Amino acid sequence: MRFVSSSAVEPTLLPPADEATVRRRGEELRALAAHHGVSVLRFASPGRLVGRVAEDKDALDTADFEIAARALLGAEVGLFSDRVLGKPHVSPDLIAAQPV
């Protein structure tokens, strides 16, 4: 069985953003997400966030958020649209993601 488990962004040498880092910068991260059309931001697991991507946004907007979030946190961040949650074989951490 395969899981939906990787974002469409090039790999980096940064460590994945841990929960403490994401929560410590949560207010800034939520504001950054809103600027990029992402709401209801949630922490899934190290380096993995889930959010509601606005209908008028696309994969390039998501990638722009990931790049900006990496710069803010100094750590790897991948964003998964909450639209994937209804798909088969979704990784359990995405389903169990908790609000930032």
Per-range role (PLM):
Residues 46-53:
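Short, aliphatic-rich beta-strand segments
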Residues 1-42, 54-100:
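Catalytic core of pol beta-like nucleotidyltransferases
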